[in-house]
Structure formats: structure tokens, C-alpha cells
């Protein structure tokens, strides 16, 4: 039978992965280790070769071509060429001083007949005439010198490369290229109307070229831009070319960019707030002794404003290098004692892991040039009383440290759902006034910061400053770089699984019923099950091993191990009841072995449903000659697997395990008692009927409970409703009826070969339930 494959997967899964168990145990072992912090906090390699980063040099160089940049409207600096590369026709450049000079450039596409167009430029609606009968692009300059004039075309540039460049000289005059991009007709023209302080509007992507590199700009106009290469970091022009540029405290600067990756420098203002937490554990006895007062890691969430934007931030504070003190007044049970209490001293460090919801923390994996500046924080302890049963209460009070920023590294915070990038700020402690003491004891004038009440009267401590880092990130801003143990990889696997599930389910309509019954009767072994995927024996063995490891953790495998005898135990309890109504107390026995069935007033429904839920386990561990639901399930899996060309080794075990758990959820099982048949379903329905006439009779719960322990459990492939319908419409012999009740494969095959619509529809309904 095809379900033999499930037994083989189950029984072999406990002997194939001893080495994997050893590996898992080794991986789960936890050790306390000391990590020597290097330049990077994560031992991962970037997908490109990194150089030494920024190097100091006595020479100042300018890149001949910097960009491209997105469209911009600003008072661009003089003596630079701005090479525009528009992707659409329309206005690509405009400038005005709002008094004596208005100018804009319109890009006309090739083979454009003369027509009039309306454009919105510089807060004005303008009607112009355009014409370009040639096969090249045409940039046309439109100018007027009075607000009452109409725009007129002055000069144009014909180019095959859709490029035009603009420059403003020291006097404010605008220059651009005129003519055609052929060797003798390309020239630079200047409009002698100074606009030194006017805003220049560039409505297309543009690159920046120094005035000293005008020859290169001309070559670009003639021959087009070069292919994008991985550039060497020298001195990026960027917007640093603006002489009046003010460095913003919060900005993202693209340092270099290739096709898939770019380097971005993130500069951020930062406000770090943190809250110390502690453990105060009282020892047993009469109430005079404390076993531990210690610091513990604590998470704190807060919000603050950064450049008018609310930032949601998180911090985790922890300590290292604490000094442990103790105090004991004597050996008596009523002597006050603190076995251990933590104190931050000069040798101590405070670590604060910080992350927020800004863009900088989305791709903090491949990082260099990480630096930060933070102010000092002064922490002062409060009062903490020790409640003694009798006498005055000692009070620990005082203590102070000053936290001085000592460095920053990368760190990762792991939660149950995701791994988060973070920055770990390290603070060195320095003791300060006042000292701490415990009233009524000899503990006095000690310097440090005890863990008894580290927050004092403060809601939180706060450090302000800024950090900067250069991160290698994907060019696509919507993609987040996966980090160690990130959910991104699992999301990719889930996406593949969803696609495989969809394809797997869509194949149900292509299964021939006669082929399915024949396949269900074959004793499938592991090699024949997986050999259809790949042609090699080694691949089949690999797939079988992977499936075994996953299958041993399935619900079916767990049920076989722990619940095989559950039905027998419950049936024995019910069979001791004298009447049906007296079995109310025994219903709980059935309910105990089923975590699905709830208490119900209908005793028969409750017991029948509970039994049906467990019948699969008993049937699974028992051999019989009929067709079972698991035979059909395994046959469907095999049939669908044969239609796959290649299946991932990690996905296939998930698919087969899910199939064993989810295929055919609505099942019916029957027990035969001479001329009487008992049938129960997983939906809570129960039937009792005669084999001779299929007349329904009273369901005897006590007799049913007795049969559970001794009778063979049979999958009701053709359930009572279908058999009755078949008998009423076609008429069947007694022998056919008995064979149908026993799920005899020969009878099923004969009815299918006869194309009987009732039997065919029943099998098709079972196949449609084979979905994951």
C-alpha cells in the first residue's frame, strides 16, 4: 500500500540523523566568550572589494563627472557645467530674475511636425510653437526681456544623444551649447543678461562638470555619456561645490554608486535615553538577609524630534566590569546581611545599544568610518530601604558616577521575530560625589554607584550627540540588506513554499482516477517515491534523508509515538458504563485524549468524534488489505511529485510533511460488527446501519466502545451516504456492498472503469481535499 512510505519515513527518521543531532547539540551549547572588537562588529564580507577608505593626501582633485543627480531648483554655484539628460520632452531648464530676463529650454522629440503647445513655466502659462523634422533631438531656447512680451525662440541644439549643458559665469551670464553635435557646428553661446542670484530650475537628471573640464563636457555632448563604472572615491563634488554650503546635522550623502550597490554616508543627531534596572533578591530565613542586589539589562522605548520628524527609538542598557561588595554583621539569623551587591567603579563600563526607525538602521550591515560624539552623563543614586521585621531599617543612599563616551561599535538585537541592527555606545565610568553609605551600618563614604536604586529621582538619563557612518547599501532603497539570522531569508523560503503549494494544489485536476487507485495499491518505498524527481540514486537518497528529518516532527509521527493506546484506554472506560446516559462521566476520558473535541451534551457525538480523531493512528499502525485515506494521500503526493522537474531539497520536506498532516481533513472510519456497521466522521457525525438493506439503526455507544478494542478500523473511502446513494440509484449486490464497506481496491477500480458517476465523484472529492 502507498501509505507504507509514511511508515518508512517515520521508522527510519530516528536512525539517519545522529550526526545532525550531534551538530544541533553543539550549536545550542552556550558559552561565555570575550570578543576582541575589530574594525567591524560583524564577521561578514561585503559583496564588493573595499579599499582602505578615506586616505589623507596633499593634492586636491576634482572628478571630471559627478552625478547623476535628481532634478533640482536652487541657486547653483557659478563656473560649473550642469549636463542635463532628460528622459521626456518638455521644459528641461528655466531661469529668471523677474525683471529683465526670462529664459527656458524646451526639448522637442525627433520627427515632430509643427504644432502649438501650452507649457507651465516659472508660474506662467505659455503658448509656443515647436517643430523638429529631423531625426535628432532638438533643445530650443525661448527668451523674453519684459514681462509683457511673448516668448520667442532664439537658439537651438540638435543632438543625437539628448544632452545639453548650462553654465553661469562669475557675472551671472548663462551659457549653453548651440548648433549641432557634429564636429564643425557645435559651439558655446552666451546670453548677456546677468542673473547672478537667480534660482536655476533643472527639470531633468543632471551631472556636474568643473569649468576646467569644458573639453570633456563638449565630448559628452558629441558622443554621449560613458557607461556607468564603479568609481574611485577621491573628493566627491556632490553639493559641496556650493561655497555657502552649511553642513546639516541629519543627512544622507551618496558617496559612490554602482549598478546594484551604493555607499551612503549617514549623519544623524541622536538623543539617547536609558533606564537602569536591578534585581533585589531577599534570602530566606527571618527576613534580615538579602542575597543579591545586581544590575540587569533593561529595554526602554521613547520618542523625540529630529529635524521636525518624530523618531521612535529603543535602548538596552547593560553593565560590565562591576565591583561586587558584601556586608555581614554577624552569624545570627537576626543579623543584617547583604551577600552580594553590585557597584559601578572606575573599572566599569556601561553599554547602551541604540536603534530607531530611521533609514540609517535599515541597512547597517557593511559599515565603515563609524564615529560618534556624545556628551557626558552624571548618574546619582537614590534611597533604598531594607525592611527588617524589627528595628530601624537600614537605608542605602547616595553614590554617583560620570559616564564618558568611550567608543561605538555595531551590534545586533535578536527578538522572537526579527534581528535588528543597532549601535552599541560604550561609556567609561568615573566615580563622583557624593559617596554612598548604608545608614546604621559601617558602610559609609564609599565611592561608586550601587545597584540598589540607580535611577534615584530620575525618570531616565539622557545623552545627546551625533553619529556618522558610511554604509554599503542596495541601490534600490526599498530593499533591506539581510543580516545574520534575519527573517529576509526565511521570507524568501516562504515565498518559494507558497509558490510550490499553489503549483502543488493546481495539479489535483490532472490526476487520473484509475491511475491513482493503481498507485495507491503499490507498496511505495523511499527510493521509488523520490526517484521521479531526479534521475540519480544519490539525489533520491538525499531527498529521502531530508524528508525523514522533517517528518519525525510532524503531527502524525508524534501521534503514533504517544497516542497509540489512547483509544483502547478510553474505550475500556466507556465499556464499563451500564447505560448510555450513565456514560456521562466517561465522556471526559474521550475528551482528555482529544485536544479538539469540547464537552457536549450529545454523548454519542462526543465519543464518536473523539474516536474518529484517533482512528487514523490505530489504522496507521495496523495492516489491512483495503485502501486507506493515507494510501490515497501518498498516491496523490507521488503523482504530483512526478510532474515536478526540480524541487528544492529544503522545500520538498515541508511539502510532504504538510501533506501528511493536512491532506483529506474530512475522514470517515467504520467498524464492522457482523451484519451491523458503525461509522464515525471527524466532523462529529455517527451512523449505524445494516449491511443487508443499508437501513440506518440506533447507534449503540456501548457496543461501539467495545468494538474499538477488538475490531479492525477501516477507512470509509466510500462513506455511508455514497453507498446508500449508489444502492438507491444503481442497485448493488450483497458481495459488492461488503467489498465496498471493506474499501476493496478491485471493486473501486471496477466502478471507476465503468465510469460510475457516484463513485467517481466521491474519489474526486477526496482528491480535492488533498490541498496544502
UniProtKB/Swiss-Prot annotation:
Which key words tag this protein in UniProt?
Capsid protein, Coiled coil, Hemagglutinin, Host cell membrane, Host cytoplasm, Host cytoskeleton, Host endoplasmic reticulum, Host membrane, Host-virus interaction, Membrane, Outer capsid protein, Viral attachment to host cell, Viral penetration into host cytoplasm, Viral penetration via permeabilization of host membrane, Virion, Virus entry into host cell
Under the heading Pfam families, the entry gives: Rota_VP4_MID, VP4_haemagglut, VP4_helical
- The keyword Coiled coil is assigned to this record: yes
Q: Tell me the segments the record calls region Spike foot.
A: 509-772
Remarks, miscellaneous: In group A rotaviruses, VP4 defines the P serotype. Some rotavirus strains are neuraminidase-sensitive and require sialic acid to attach to the cell surface. Some rotavirus strains are integrin-dependent. Some rotavirus strains depend on ganglioside for their entry into the host cell. Hsp70 also seems to be involved in the entry of some strains.
Protein name per UniProt: Outer capsid protein VP4
Annotated site location: Cleavage: 232-233, 242-243
> Which region ranges are annotated with the description Spike head?
65-225
Residues annotated as site: Probable cleavage = 245-246
GO cellular component, as recorded: host cell endoplasmic reticulum-Golgi intermediate compartment; host cell plasma membrane; host cell rough endoplasmic reticulum; host cytoskeleton; membrane; viral outer capsid
Q: Which GO terms describe its biological process?
A: permeabilization of host organelle membrane involved in viral entry into host cell; virion attachment to host cell
Matching Gene3D superfamilies, A to Z? 1.20.5.170, 2.60.120.200
Coiled-coil spans in chain? 483-510
Region of interest: Hydrophobic? 388-408
Q: Which residues cross the membrane?
A: none
Natural source organism: Rotavirus A (isolate RVA/Cow/Japan/KK3/1983/G10P8[11])
Which intervals of the chain are annotated as region Spike body and stalk (antigen domain)?
247-478
Q: Which family does it belong to?
A: Belongs to the rotavirus VP4 family.
Indicate yes or no for the key word Glycoprotein.
no
Please name the InterPro entries in this protein's record.
ConA-like_dom_sf, Rota_A_VP4, Rota_VP4_MID, Rota_VP4_MID_sf, VP4_concanavalin-like, VP4_helical
Print the organism lineage: Viruses, Riboviria, Orthornavirae, Duplornaviricota, Resentoviricetes
